[in-house]
Amino acid sequence: MDNLFTFLHEIEDRYARTIFNFHLISCDEIGDIYGLMKERISSEDMFDNIVYNKDIHPAIKKLVYCDIQLTKHIINQNTYPVFNDSSQVKCCHYFDINSDNSNISSRTVEIFESEKSSLVSYIKTTNKKRKVNYGEIKKTVHGGTNANYFSGKKSDEYLSTTVRSNINQPWIKTISKRMRVDIINHSIVTRGKSSILQTIEIIFTNRTCVKIFKDSTMHIILSKDKDEKGCINMIDKLFYVYYNLFLLFEDIIQNEYFKEVANVVNHVLMATALDEKLFLIKKMAEHDVYGVSNFKIGMFNLTFIKSLDHTVFPSLLDEDSKIKFFKGKKLNIVALRSLEDCTNYVTKSENMIEMMKERSTILNSIDIETESVDRLKELLLK
């Protein structure tokens, strides 16, 4: 981890990170984080009864548990604004909301109706304006006019699916769904699977998302703010997430180890100089401290922050290159999966920029109208 941050610091005058995802690999010392969090979230409907430590409340926006049988969101109401504009309601035609109408539940309803949550994204994805049923096309080919085509409503206690079709093309379906949602206090509950993955998610107020899988491996999607400047800000954001995450684990799992790790993490946050932060991170790695010793890069992108004032020559890019140009002028390096990957493509990027500058200078010095076609091809296509 310290070597990665050292290199990102070395190039931060030219490159800034955008997407940054990483994993914390499960290890035996930490216990069953997934199972214990699942048990706590499943049995409670108040945020305070799950997250006892009030010091970390401002950092955590929402907890989500999702499996095949149940999806449950627990929201921290204090992290949401008051929604006064009814035009912000995003989901009323997708959901039937059941609530006990208490003040707490009514506030949760207001938040649910105004926030674009993962439930809204899921139900929008499963609502299909037009879908071709190829099985029914096959019936038409082999069965003639007597083939049966389904249209109508299918429903259970929590999900109603309406299938409509055109009489002239009955194999083309329009599918709409409505989901029942039960809101009690801080909890938003629906039955059945509402996500591709079975995970526990912790959504932070800074938009960072931590996904915990059944084996307690974690996937962390680190958010990026416009005011993030350089590697030191990135380290502070990551270790701020660590600090609050580990105190949450200590809260729920009752494992003192996480409190000790949170204290070590806090030393990194308190350090003011980058060199001091990197030194502390290196020491954490040497002592096999959770969060550093089991850190594994998932994927990250870099963007070249300086303007490209010269002509861009796409012919210099390999077909499978991770160097991409956005709108012709913005250079991005995408899907980097290791420090070696990063250093390799930054070197390629630097060399390519220099080659483009040289070609651009030559191109600007010649008369395009009188120059030979072969010479122009050599500049533009090779």
Curated annotation (Swiss-Prot):
UniProt keyword terms in alphabetical order: Activator, Transcription, Transcription regulation
Q: Which InterPro entries match?
A: Poxvirus_intermed-TF (IPR008789)
A Pfam family of this chain: Pox_int_trans
> What function does this protein fulfil?
Acts with RNA polymerase to initiate transcription from intermediate gene promoters.
Indicate the quaternary assembly: Heterodimer of a 45 kDa and a 32 kDa subunit.
Similarity comment: Belongs to the poxviruses A23 family.
Q: What is this protein called?
A: Intermediate transcription factor 3 large subunit
What is the native source organism of this protein? Monkeypox virus (strain Zaire-96-I-16)
User: Which lineage?
Assistant: Viruses, Varidnaviria, Bamfordvirae, Nucleocytoviricota, Pokkesviricetes
